[in-house]
């Protein structure tokens, strides 16, 4: 499986290679410019807008600029005029050496859309160098028997200029023995040969000298000179001869210094010193002399400087074998440099865009070029990025690539990407170059605020102070910057009757909720509303949450005594027969509390009594009963004060005062009589009062039944609009009783009244309350109405 994956990857790389080669062959049109070397920086080269047929403002709007593969900006583009100018002074000899023509390649990058234009700049040579002889003095040893027409090699002059500005001719100072003949070597260089015009005579002229002058073809021409000394030697009539007239050898460019490249060999038929051969490099350029060395005795050619295939691919060297008599032979050695994969690919970034918006696909992030100066497979390259990134590489002309987003990005998932661009050649071993870049993702408003809870429940005690902080809501936004800044607001309530604007307010910055006024549990137990969270993006996004506010009851209402009605001018009087048994029900104190829960749990106790121990009050229902048998010695009149107390904190209380009259029977009530009143008058008055009392009780019973029915119907019609309340759960103290119905002032209190006529004690019982909660004003009114039931004896019902 591993071999199969490797093979697949190799096939993909080969396909990408063919695509790149095809695109490079089908590149866009090339525009050529020409400029002479040594021109000052800022010199005009050409007008790009005119040549391309574009308007100058289009070059500016598309961000046109000049880029090059060698990372040196030798040209600059004036986007205001479209002129291409020199950024530096160009030296043709430094840039191209002996290569002619000297052409530099540039690209013009334009964006929106991305476009590459190929530019060739030809650097024209000027005659700024004079011919130079490496040796200012040459020594020639010529045998005297050299025939007329014999040719002798002279060292050639070096001129860094090319073309017509290179060395064109050689001359020598006038003499009668020699003239100059021009030759061209394999490197297309001209070199001089000295031709013998007149036989030499050692005895007549053992030595002669003349000036050798090299002239170039410039205008005006430049020249260089060297002194030639000719020493006439005696009879040496055999020249050295090489085994081969031409040698060819191939060596890798990474050969170590000092390694043996080739050994040349020559022989001379002469004997003695005339047969001794000396090997030298003839007409060698400076590069050859720096790179190679020949052993003068053995003919071994060794490497003295590193080779670089990318700089010079081959060398042609003339080896000269000279004997002691001055005769020589020559052979040509061609050294072919073999390329090795010693150069890693290079990446040149032309432009980069960061940050990029998160929701825009196919955005150009980077424009870059790649190259490998090796040759063959060593110079073929493939480019890749990790597959798990939402980016894609797209190739362009001349090894240019664009890095683009493959799909919309999500900043909330990944805020930045570290991208490694890997460029690998196909040499052995493979060399690669990695370029790391960080791309930041800018935020767009694509996330609405989110509340930490879908609903909030807040508890507020009633009677709170205005502007009280009752709670907070919180929302977060996954975006960043202003897109994540949240503003809070109150939304219009669904219930149009809810005065939300006067109840609560919200801090727009932090979501704190405040009660605007004091709340009353008895008026409003609970309410709910919705809050909104809106970010500051464009367009703004929002969300909402439900807030429920529950008002907690406080013990702010004292118990209210319903029965007996408290009227300072007409206190309640109860009749008790002296024959009553212990536990006889005298009356029942009925009270209510406007609060709820334990604040409405009431307990009763006898606070004061005329005769302690005679009467008792049941703590849980307020019933007043006799505690023992009555006797004739007990006083006829008794005043009882009953304390009604709730279970709040702190507790609130009320008192009920009632008068008890002990009588021998209901037919003979004991009442104080005027001293002159006759007995018959007492009987008549008692009968009248009993009739009035019976009528009052009957009317009160009938009125209670009607009131019960009316309250039932009213409660049923208002059940939907009345807010719910919480009722304390669990057991409560046995001495307490909740007489508040459902525990709220908005509920009605209902009492059923029953007078047991058949019992021995004729008890008057209140079984269940059935009257609405009475406010302060109503209390006085009810007291006035109930005062009509009193008679002259002080009885009331």
Curated annotation (Swiss-Prot):
<dbReference type="InterPro" id="IPR015919">
    <property type="entry name" value="Cadherin-like_sf"/>
</dbReference>
<keyword id="KW-0130">Cell adhesion</keyword>
<comment type="function">
    <text>Potential calcium-dependent cell-adhesion protein. May be involved in the establishment and maintenance of specific neuronal connections in the brain.</text>
</comment>
<dbReference type="GO" id="GO:0007156">
    <property type="term" value="P:homophilic cell adhesion via plasma membrane adhesion molecules"/>
</dbReference>
<keyword id="KW-0677">Repeat</keyword>
<keyword id="KW-1003">Cell membrane</keyword>
<feature type="glycosylation site" description="N-linked (GlcNAc...) asparagine">
    <location>
        <position position="436"/>
    </location>
</feature>
<feature type="topological domain" description="Extracellular">
    <location>
        <begin position="27"/>
        <end position="690"/>
    </location>
</feature>
<feature type="domain" description="Cadherin 1">
    <location>
        <begin position="35"/>
        <end position="133"/>
    </location>
</feature>
<feature type="transmembrane region" description="Helical">
    <location>
        <begin position="691"/>
        <end position="711"/>
    </location>
</feature>
<dbReference type="InterPro" id="IPR013164">
    <property type="entry name" value="Cadherin_N"/>
</dbReference>
<feature type="topological domain" description="Cytoplasmic">
    <location>
        <begin position="712"/>
        <end position="797"/>
    </location>
</feature>
<feature type="domain" description="Cadherin 6">
    <location>
        <begin position="568"/>
        <end position="671"/>
    </location>
</feature>
<feature type="domain" description="Cadherin 3">
    <location>
        <begin position="247"/>
        <end position="347"/>
    </location>
</feature>
<dbReference type="GO" id="GO:0007155">
    <property type="term" value="P:cell adhesion"/>
</dbReference>
<feature type="glycosylation site" description="N-linked (GlcNAc...) asparagine">
    <location>
        <position position="418"/>
    </location>
</feature>
<feature type="glycosylation site" description="N-linked (GlcNAc...) asparagine">
    <location>
        <position position="487"/>
    </location>
</feature>
<protein>
    <recommendedName>
        <fullName>Protocadherin beta-11</fullName>
    </recommendedName>
</protein>
<keyword id="KW-0106">Calcium</keyword>
<dbReference type="GO" id="GO:0005509">
    <property type="term" value="F:calcium ion binding"/>
</dbReference>
<dbReference type="Pfam" id="PF00028">
    <property type="entry name" value="Cadherin"/>
</dbReference>
<feature type="signal peptide">
    <location>
        <begin position="1"/>
        <end position="26"/>
    </location>
</feature>
<keyword id="KW-0732">Signal</keyword>
<dbReference type="GO" id="GO:0007399">
    <property type="term" value="P:nervous system development"/>
</dbReference>
<keyword id="KW-0812">Transmembrane</keyword>
<dbReference type="GO" id="GO:0005886">
    <property type="term" value="C:plasma membrane"/>
</dbReference>
<dbReference type="InterPro" id="IPR002126">
    <property type="entry name" value="Cadherin-like_dom"/>
</dbReference>
<dbReference type="Pfam" id="PF08266">
    <property type="entry name" value="Cadherin_2"/>
</dbReference>
<dbReference type="InterPro" id="IPR050174">
    <property type="entry name" value="Protocadherin/Cadherin-CA"/>
</dbReference>
<feature type="glycosylation site" description="N-linked (GlcNAc...) asparagine">
    <location>
        <position position="567"/>
    </location>
</feature>
<dbReference type="InterPro" id="IPR032455">
    <property type="entry name" value="Cadherin_C"/>
</dbReference>
<feature type="domain" description="Cadherin 4">
    <location>
        <begin position="352"/>
        <end position="451"/>
    </location>
</feature>
<feature type="domain" description="Cadherin 2">
    <location>
        <begin position="138"/>
        <end position="242"/>
    </location>
</feature>
<dbReference type="InterPro" id="IPR020894">
    <property type="entry name" value="Cadherin_CS"/>
</dbReference>
<dbReference type="Pfam" id="PF16492">
    <property type="entry name" value="Cadherin_C_2"/>
</dbReference>
<feature type="domain" description="Cadherin 5">
    <location>
        <begin position="456"/>
        <end position="561"/>
    </location>
</feature>
<keyword id="KW-0325">Glycoprotein</keyword>
<keyword id="KW-1133">Transmembrane helix</keyword>
<keyword id="KW-0472">Membrane</keyword>
